[in-house]
Amino acid sequence: MTCRQSAVRVVGLALVLGLFLLESRVVAAGDRKVLRPRVPPDQIETARAVKNPLPATPELIEKGKALYHGKAFCLTCHGRDGKGLGRDVDPKLVQGVLPRNFTERAWQKARTDGELMWVLKNGIPGTAMAVFVGPVVTEEEAWQLILYVRSFGPSP
């Protein structure tokens, strides 16, 4: 192998390594954004302390599913499978935050039921996530929705 061939090989490997590292940083940055709490810092501890008063029974999860697919129209944005790409979502046209992917293990682990309830009660400014508790569902129905959303996550 000539000196020139060695230099080309080294440069090629450096480019591949550089692209790999850049991609890793982009993925890591995306993960941090996914895990960023949507509850304001001055309310986060209070929200995290709130527990779902309903047990995760098959009947209540099924009620949450009926709400998700019906009255609360969650599937429109979050999709039937909870992956955040509902029928009204075109990722190429969305500016800013895409609808939450409820199947992400890290997100399921990081967010508490109380934080999810806070979002349902307050919406998320700057996104399409509106206030749902009150205008669309009752608080009890919101807890049922949360039980169903948890069913998209990995089994404990």
Regions found by a protein language model. Name each.
Residues 58-80, 88-91:
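Sequence/structural segment immediately N-terminal to covalent heme-attachment motifs in c-type
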Residues 36-69, 156:
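Electrostatic cytochrome c docking/interface patches
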Residues 93-133, 137-149:
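Extracytoplasmic electron-transfer domains, predominantly the class I c-type cytochrome c fold
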Residues 11-22:
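Bacterial N-terminal signal peptides
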Residues 23-28:
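Sec/Tat signal peptide C-region and signal peptidase I cleavage site
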Residues 2-12:
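Bacterial N-terminal signal peptides that target proteins for export
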Residues 29-36:
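Cleaved targeting-peptide boundary
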Residues 78, 150-153:
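Protein kinase-like catalytic domain
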